Regions:
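Bacterial Sec-dependent signal peptides at the C-terminal "C-region" and cleavage site
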Residues: 2-31
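Short helix/turn-capping signatures at newly exposed starts of structured segments
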Residues: 23-46
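A short Gly-Trp-Pro
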Residues: 35, 44-78, 84-164
Length: 164
């Protein structure tokens, strides 16, 4: 019995070591340099508590609670942290999810896509490429022409209405 427990313990420790080392090797942000970098204290000073929780701690706002999920005005959606233009209202659509949804980013380099295996799900997380703010996730169930659904947190966005 003692031998069985020792073997099981060894297997558990080995599995933990392998999973921890795998995460470091596969870091998708390893070679990315964010151009806007602030300390946690600096982010807390410029963001509301909810903005900080979502963008810096990778949380998610409640569905149907954000300012932009029903916004139909024309304009540009920007990162709330660094003001980088991210999405154009021309690519926004009603997804029925309770979060603002877009089928295309304003520019492919505006966002970063990284694997997110949290909560037992396999998803793709979306970050601002300039400051690393968590924006939301992208799914492959969107409309044409891309078939993508960028599902974003309103609180991670600023909206700049068209001047017209």
């Amino acid at each position: 019995m003692k031998t069985v427990l020792v073997i099981l313990g060894f297997i558990c420790v080995l599995g933990l070591v392998i999973s921890l080392s795998k995460g470091k090797e596969d870091d998708p942000l390893k070679n990315h340099k964010f151009t806007v970098v602030k300390t946690e204290a600096e982010w807390r000073k410029i963001l509301t508590p909810e903005q900080y929780k979502v963008t810096r701690q990778r949380s998610t706002e409640l569905a149907c609670s954000g300012a932009y999920w029903k916004n139909h005005e024309k304009g540009i959606y920007k990162c709330v942290c660094c003001k980088l233009p991210l999405f154009d209202s021309k690519t926004k659509f009603e997804s029925g999810t309770g979060w603002p949804s877009f089928y295309k980013a304003i520019h492919k380099d505006a966002i970063l896509e990284i694997p997110d295996d949290s909560f037992g799900m396999s998803r793709t997380e979306i970050l601002c490429s300039r400051c690393g703010a968590h924006l939301g996730h992208v799914f492959d169930d969107g409309p044409r022409p891309t078939g993508l659904r960028y599902c974003l947190n309103s609180v991670a966005l600023d909206f700049e209405k068209d001047a017209k």
